[in-house]
C-alpha cells in the first residue's frame, strides 16, 4: 500500500489545509515519538531526543509548538535549534548523537506552504519502512505519557555557530577566500544567520541579500528559484561570483561575474572534473531524469559512468549508495557529495565549487568549456489533486508528436511533482524554439484534458 502522507521530501502542503494543520502535526509528533521510543538506541532509563529546526515562515512557530507537544506526549525529549538550514539539522542530529532530526520547511515553496521532514540518527532521510511505521501510528489514539514520563524541551545553545564551523571544516585548510567578492543570497530563509558568516570567516568580501526574513517573504523574488535578483546584484557590485540558496538552503545556484547562471547539472560536472584532477579518477556520478543530455555526454567523454535516478534528491542518494559513488546532483541545485555530508547542502556545495576553482585556477566558464547545454523548456501545469492525465489520448498524442519530431535530437519528460499538485512538462532540444514549441503544445493538451 502506498504512503498516505509522506511524499518524496516529507509531508508538505498549504498551512491550514490537511495535513498541515496543528492537530495533525501534533499527532505526527506523537506518532514519530512512539516509533522512536521503540527503535532508538538510548541508554537504559533514558529518553530519545530529537532536534527540531525550521525555516523562517510565520507558520513555523505554530508547527514547532505542535510537534514539540506531540513528542513530549510520547515521552521524547526535544531540542530546539530555531531557524536552521535543513542540512544543518542533519549534521547536528548526527554530531550530537540524537535519535532523530525534524525540519519544518517547505523548501523552495512560497510562504503559505510548509512541511515536515525527518532525519534518522545518522543524518539521512528516513527509510520508507520507518515512514510507514509513523503513518501506522497516526491511526492509533493518542495516549499521553504519565507526568513523570513526559518529554522535556530546551533550546540548543549556539546551533548556528556549530553548523558554521562544520561548513568551514569542509573547505581545504590550505585555501582561503581572501580577495574574492561574493554576493550571497539567502532567500530570506533558514540560512540568513549562517551562510554570510561562513564565507566571511573564510576571508571573502561578502555582500548579503535575502537576509531580512519577516515570515512572509521567503523565496519571494530571491534565492535559488528566483536568481534574477542575484544576477543583478553581482553585476551592480562588480562581484566575482554570486551564490544563491533556497529557503532551507539545500539547493545551490551560482552566478559568475558576467551574470551567467550555473545550475546543478553544470556544477556537478565541475565537481567531477575537480575530483578527476585530484584523485585521478571518478568511477561514476548520478543525475536525474531531468539532467541535461549535454552533461551526460560530457561526463561519459571524460570516462565517468553516468546513471539517471528518479527526480528527487532521496533517489539520487539511493543510486549513489547502490553504486558506491560520491557525487550526484539535480539541475535544481541539490548537490550530494557523500564524503562531505549525508545530504544535499547548498553552503557546503558552494565551498566545494570554490575549492575546485582555487585548485584549477580557472573560472566556471573555463571549467565548462566545450559543454553546451541543450535548451530545456520546463512548464509546470497546476492540476487538481488526484487529476488523471496518464490515460488521456490527447495528452498522449501531443507527447508522441513531440517525440517523433525530436527523434535522436532531444527528449520529452512528463512527471507529476512529488511535492506540489503540478505536472512538470520538460522538453529538451538542440534548438530553444523547438523545445518551447513542443513543451507549450503538451502543456496546453494537459490543461485541456484536466480542466
Swiss-Prot record:
Gene Ontology molecular function: magnesium ion binding; phosphoglucosamine mutase activity; phosphomannomutase activity
EC number: 5.4.2.10
Family, per entry: Belongs to the phosphohexose mutase family.
Catalytic residues (UniProt): 107
Keywords of the record: Isomerase, Magnesium, Metal-binding, Phosphoprotein
Cofactor(s), names only, from the UniProt record: Mg(2+)
Matches recorded under PROSITE patterns: PGM_PMM
Keyword presence, Lipid biosynthesis: no
GO cellular component: cytosol
Task of the protein: Catalyzes the conversion of glucosamine-6-phosphate to glucosamine-1-phosphate.
Name of the protein this chain belongs to: Phosphoglucosamine mutase
Modified residues (Phosphoserine): 107
Organism: Burkholderia multivorans (strain ATCC 17616 / 249)
GO biological process annotation, one example: UDP-N-acetylglucosamine biosynthetic process
Entry note: cofactor: Binds 1 Mg(2+) ion per subunit.
Top-level taxon of origin: Bacteria
Cited HAMAP family: GlmM_B
Binding sites annotated in the UniProt record for Mg(2+): 107, 246, 248, 250
Post-translational modification: Activated by phosphorylation.
Catalytic activity: alpha-D-glucosamine 1-phosphate = D-glucosamine 6-phosphate
Amino acid at each position: 500500500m502506498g504512503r498516505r502522507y509522506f511524499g518524496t521530501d516529507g509531508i508538505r502542503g498549504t498551512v491550514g489545509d490537511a495535513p498541515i494543520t496543528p492537530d495533525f502535526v501534533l499527532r505526527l509528533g506523537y506518532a514519530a515519538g512512539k516509533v522512536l521510543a521503540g527503535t532508538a538506541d538510548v541508554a537504559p532509563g533514558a529518553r530519545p531526543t530529537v532536534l527540531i529546526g525550521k525555516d523562517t515562515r510565520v507558520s513555523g512557530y505554530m508547527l514547532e509548538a505542535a510537534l514539540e507537544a506531540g513528542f513530549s506526549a510520547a515521552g521524547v525529549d526535544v531540542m530546539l535549534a530555531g531557524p536552521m538550514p535543513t542540512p544543518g539539522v542533519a549534521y547536528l542530529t548526527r554530531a550530537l548523537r540524537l535519535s532523530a532530526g525534524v525540519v519544518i520547511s517547505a523548501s523552495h515553496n512560497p510562504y503559505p506552504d510548509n512541511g515536515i521532514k525527518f532525519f534518522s540518527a545518522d543524518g539521512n532521510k528516513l527509510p520508507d519502512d520507518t515512514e510507514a511505521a509513523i503513518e501506522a501510528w497516526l491511526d492509533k489514539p493518542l495516549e499521553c505519557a504519565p507526568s513523570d514520563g513526559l518529554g522535556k524541551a530546551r533550546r540548543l545553545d549556539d546551533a548556528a555557530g556549530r553548523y558554521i564551523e562544520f561548513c568551514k571544516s569542509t573547505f581545504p585548510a590550505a585555501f582561503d577566500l581572501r580577495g574574492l567578492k561574493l554576493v550571497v543570497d539567502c532567500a530570506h530563509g533558514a540560512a540568513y544567520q549562517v551562510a554570510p558568516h561562513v564565507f566571511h570567516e573564510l576571508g571573502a568580501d561578502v555582500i548579503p541579500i535575502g537576509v531580512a526574513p519577516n515570515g512572509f517573504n521567503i523565496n519571494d523574488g530571491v534565492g535559488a528559484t528566483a536568481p534574477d535578483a542575484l544576477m543583478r546584484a553581482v553585476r551592480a557590485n562588480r562581484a566575482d561570483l554570486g551564490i544563491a540558496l533556497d529557503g532551507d538552503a539545500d539547493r545551490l545556484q551560482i552566478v559568475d561575474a558576467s551574470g551567467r547562471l550555473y545550475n546543478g547539472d553544470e556544477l556537478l560536472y565541475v565537481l567531477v572534473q575537480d575530483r578527476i584532477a585530484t584523485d585521478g579518477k571518478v568511477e561514476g556520478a548520478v543525475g536525474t531524469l531531468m539532467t541535461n543530455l549535454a552533461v551526460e555526454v560530457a561526463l561519459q567523454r571524460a570516462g565517468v559512468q553516468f546513471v539517471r535516478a528518479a527526480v528527487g534528491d532521496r533517489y539520487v542518494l539511493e543510486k549513489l549508495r547502490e553504486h558506491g559513488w560520491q557525487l550526484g546532483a539535480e539541475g535544481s541545485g541539490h548537490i550530494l557529495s557523500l564524503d562531505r555530508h549525508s545530504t544535499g547542502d547548498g553552503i557546503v556545495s558552494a565551498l566545494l565549487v570554490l575549492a575546485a576553482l582555487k585548485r584549477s585556477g580557472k573560472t566556471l566558464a573555463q571549467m565548462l568549456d566545450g559543454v553546451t547545454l541543450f535548451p530545456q523548456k520546463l512548464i509546470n501545469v497546476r492540476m487538481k489533486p488526484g487529476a488523471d492525465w496518464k490515460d488521456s489520448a490527447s495528452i498522449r498524442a501531443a507527447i508522441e508528436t513531440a517525440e517523433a519530431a525530436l527523434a535522436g535530437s532531444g527528449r520529452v519528460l512528463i512527471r507529476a511533482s512529488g511535492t506540489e499538485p503540478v505536472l512538470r512538462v520538460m522538453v529538451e532540444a538542440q534548438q530553444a524554439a523547438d523545445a518551447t514549441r513542443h513543451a507549450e503544445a503538451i502543456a496546453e493538451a494537459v490543461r485541456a484534458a484536466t480542466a
